């Protein structure tokens, strides 16, 4: 058994995604465009695109928006040229934060990210300053009550790296990043549908915040998340109710 309430954290995150559905569509469309530009528009031959499209379907993004984003990447439609950038830094209490961005203006983006860090008690660091605190992997979370033994057998057979039952009864399955969709497909075919899944940078440790400190930390994360150029935020911070 391991971890804080992963299930509660996932439900909270899904709720926030629902509240910001329009922004989520925009961010995922960017990722689809970049993925299709880099690897082509066929999800069968482009793992990154397949993950992005799977994510789009997970938030009920309309098919026409997905198709438009792909065509912008392949050049069938005119689109914006995006640059991928990752910024690293610290929140209050030294919590590690990584910020992945897609931007058409690097100068604007770095200024906005730095401002968000400094305004809410954090600070930007140099490249690599916190990356060692995260593991690049595929992650799936299954609901409490899932048959742990059967899921573990199916996950191992499908090529998962690790299966962990959390304190709250939810089950976490980790995969190599490039094998995420193959493992997910195999588990769904075996009758196990994750409540949440993504290719992510999973924190190796936790900085737990509560009360006023938790509120401060959430404000920093919200400020970063609300920036148009920010795609994903990864952090060691765990904010308890």
Curated annotation (Swiss-Prot):
Coiled coil: none annotated. Residues 1-22 are annotated as: Disordered. One of its GO terms (cellular component) is cytosol. Pfam families: TACO1_YebC_N, Transcrip_reg. One of its GO terms (molecular function) is DNA binding. One of its GO terms (biological process) is regulation of DNA-templated transcription. InterPro entries: Integrase-like_N, TACO1_YebC-like_2nd/3rd_dom, TACO1_YebC_N, Transcrip_reg_TACO1-like, Transcrip_reg_TACO1-like_dom3, YebC-like. It is found in: Cytoplasm. Keywords: Cytoplasm, DNA-binding, Transcription, Transcription regulation. HAMAP family: Transcrip_reg_TACO1. PANTHER family: TRANSCRIPTIONAL REGULATORY PROTEIN YEBC-RELATED, TRANSLATIONAL ACTIVATOR OF CYTOCHROME C OXIDASE 1. This is Probable transcriptional regulatory protein Daro_4067.
